[in-house]
Amino acid sequence: MVIENRSLRTEPRGGVLLEWATMSVETPDMDELLRLVPTVGYGDDAPADRRGGALHLSAVLPALSAAIGHPAPTKVHADPKACQRALGLPDAESAIVVLVDGLGYWNLAMRLGHAPYLRSLMNESANQRPIATCAPSTTVAAMAAFGTGTCPGLTAMAGYTQLEPASHKLIQLIQFKDALAPKPANPHIPVPPMVDPLDLQREETVFEKLAAQEVRVTSSGLPKFSKSPLTEAALRGTDYQGNVTPRDRVLAAARASRTPGLTYLYIRDADKVGHNYGWDSEHWVAAFEHIDAQLALLKRSAPKGTLIVIVADHGMVQTDMDQRIDIAVEPQLTRGVSLVGGEPRSLMLYAEPDERPEDIACRWRDYLQDRALVRTKDEAIADGLFGPVCERVRPMLGDVVVQAAGAVTLVDSRTQGDKATHLPSVHGSQTALEMDIPCLIDMA
């Protein structure tokens, strides 16, 4: 497939070539985008393959702290100025960072004909390379890595669901609730968090580090996210400004940037619509066009000289129901497994007390073959999958970690409802389509 001069035509072979004005980006074909990529590392260098190190979601806030003149080092990014140089961020008194949930680099690239503002940014050579998100490539893990400038092995947020060791239950880390508990009779009565978010996620956020330096730090988002468990865990430390409409959230971010400091704006539509309808649906394209309009409004409304950086937490994969595997009906997969955490593209398996993780991993490898990468906890940690792992976090991680390749999904009908097992688009694994995210730089 070839995209030229803002038009689309199809070729029988090869990747996708995106061309407009002076810009040309070759997009691999879908088979290549759905292959597992090497595990990315953390640090302050820009690796030769341009994945990981300082070219990582976790490096964005440290880099921005340096760009606004208040470097905030973290445990995995000790040199914010090096991160700033690697990402190519200019100095500025005021900066806005926008995180568009679910807008992976290749999802963006393959739909740029619908996004005039984002297309204009992709004319710049500095914006034509993706950076990496964390593994697993999912919102809770990525938000915590982004907010703290660290990694899942330190934040204790390593999957959509994971083991809570004290109760030996699965905790769902969007709302910090018991993942397997029955739905409450009255859904309007809030369920208290299973664990205190500040106790689970103990790393200081970059926002907190900046606030301690008396730097203005503002968040603009939906009112309901102001004190949510995920915000408290991963993104605490800002003056949160809640507004109902997207336009008001954008304008609030622009107003805040009149004062030197850092502003964070969250846009969730690409992920939400992708899960409900699929990222290749007309609904997703409409949401994408709306996102582009919001970002263009931000550019027009922000004070001149404001640095604008646009990133995402992960990309999205269109599911193939023919490649869907239900663990519940495969005895080889359920044997020896007490709990199944994670999500359909990235599972964490917790072994029964007398079961060896190596034996579980062997059975899963035999069954899945090249449809997934199966590692024991020790192997995954040694590979650097979660970044540096502290001893407190280690028991929370699965005894076996499984990451799907291709369009494979791994579901469990014993504990998941029909909607959860049939999501049109998902994420979480270690493919380029999920791991590669944009880092688009603009100046108002």
What are these regions (language model features)?
Residues 9-10:
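N-terminal start and proteolytic maturation junction detector
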